[in-house]
Amino acid sequence: MSIVARKEKQKQEIRSLILEESMKLFVEEGFSKVSVRKIAERVQYSPTTLYLYFKDKNEILFYCCESGFEKMLEHNIALGLISDPIERLHQMGVNYLNFGLENPEYYDLMFIQEAPMAALIEMGAGWSSGDQALEALKMIVQDAMDKGLLVPAK
């Protein structure tokens, strides 16, 4: 392995460690009670080192949630193989519940705590994988409506 490749691998490992431990802290203590200094203590790096990887605590939160949505999307890859939109919708619900049970930290950060939305607004950003998850749901519902299996409320 070349020096450049080894350094890049080390950089990704540190970044992953920061995200993993930050997520645990956000869930344990709440986003507002966690500081970059506290995250740095947890990962045993200086706060300055964390700023080499992330702009601020909000950016750390953003990438924690983005990672969660990516994991959630992985649960839904096989949905396209189900032709019946009602069955697809049902399976998406099952996948959502299983995701929450298998990944309680991600679930709490993504859907329970208010901090992610505030961080998104402050950053002026959006979650591409979160948007994809919502779009998949909308497409299933629209397919069911197109086939007359779901009727809009009047």
Where are these regions (language model features)?
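N-terminal intrinsically disordered/low-complexity leader segments
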Residues: M1-E13, K24
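Hydrophobic/aromatic residues within well-ordered alpha-helical segments
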Residues: I14, K57, C64, G68, ...
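Helix-turn-helix
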Residues: L17, E21, L25-E59, Y63
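Short coil/turn segments at alpha/beta junctions that flank glycine-rich nucleotide-binding fingerprints
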Residues: E28-S32, N103, K147
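Alpha-helical DNA-contacting segments of helix-turn-helix folds
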Residues: I60-G68, N76, M110, A118
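Hydrophobic alpha-helical connector segments
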Residues: Y63, I77-Y106
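Amphipathic alpha-helical packing segments from all-alpha helical-bundle domains
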Residues: I77, I121-K147
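Amphipathic alpha-helical segments used for helix-helix packing
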Residues: E102-I121
